[in-house]
Amino acid sequence: MLSEDEAKDLLSFLTLEMRADVKGQATGYILGLTGNRDGCRYLQSKPDFLKALVTLTSDPSIAIVKDCFHALINLSADETLHQPLVKETEILSKLIPKLQDPEFVFSDRICTILSNLSRHEQTCRDVFKALQELNVGLDRLVEIFCTEGFNKKASLHYLAPLLSNLTQLPEARHFILDKDRCVIQRLLPFTQYEESITRRGGVVGTLRNCCFDYVHHEWLLSDAVDILPFLLLPLAGPEELSEEENEGLPVDLQYLPEDKRREEDPDIRKMLLETLMLLTATKVGRQILKSKNVYPIMREFHKWEKDPHVISACEKLVQALIGDEPEVGMENLMEVEIPKDVEEKLQELDAKEQEQMEKDKQELEKSQNESPEGLER
């Protein structure tokens, strides 16, 4: 790495006033450092370099700004850099307001940086607080996200994982679930947004987080929100169901066409199942999912699914749908207190199950990659 004198000289080149060619070489060197862990950890102890990168995101040179944003994306991907970036620089106050500029070229990079910084609770709170203080707020963020073509130069897909990360905070979920704001209803259609897996996954993650607030389950499943079809449709396929089974389903799930395709990403399929599973944690949720005939959709999905982790999530949901009701006093599974020894045993069993599923997944991938003997590729 650089000596102290070399670092001092390099830092002197990272100013708005420096000649563009010299500055470009300096930002290019810093970008190279951020391409590996050792370089990132070196910069972790150099807050002046971090400050300079943030400042240069306002440079007149597009090439220099691009390098700085690329470097900040790399740095923000390293959790150990989150606190230095948030506490030692003006990264939040400099970048967040630019999201509201429909002409800003680098908005997608800002979304990625904010998504990275909000992955863990401590800096997630910093991001949430900054949004409020800078008069952007979740309401404006959702409005920008839901306005197609808001920025002609950026897709803003990474606002979805940012929203998902923010909803790990109770106060963010409280906003999304505010019955007077009609926020969650605006997000629901994006569970089937074909143009971007990032947008779909982020929205499904947001819905899953919101379903941890079980007091809202009845409202979420009511006609006021009608969340169920938006969770089920990506899991439903073209299989023909009986007339009786179709009639029991929500209208949007009835008599699906022969070319109906399921969600292609296994991680999103798993999150959808986990969201449905959360809704079965309350008595009212279980009753509604059973009355809406969710089981046939899951039955056909289970036949189709190949990923071991997703299959396991599906089987747990099916068990909740067809199993007996919990005994009196245990109707709300999120309020049940589990003895510590039982909890530890369950965690141990879950770890073993995860390990076995990972082995199964590796075996499946291996078998899919091997060519049948005697056949030309």
Swiss-Prot record:
Residues 339-377 are annotated as: Disordered. Disulfide bonds: none annotated. The keyword Transferase does not apply. SUPFAM superfamilies: ARM repeat (SSF48371). It holds the Pfam family DUF383. It comes from the Eukaryota. Residues 340-373 form a coiled coil. Keywords: Coiled coil. Belongs to the HGH1 family. This is Protein HGH1 homolog. The gene is hgh1.
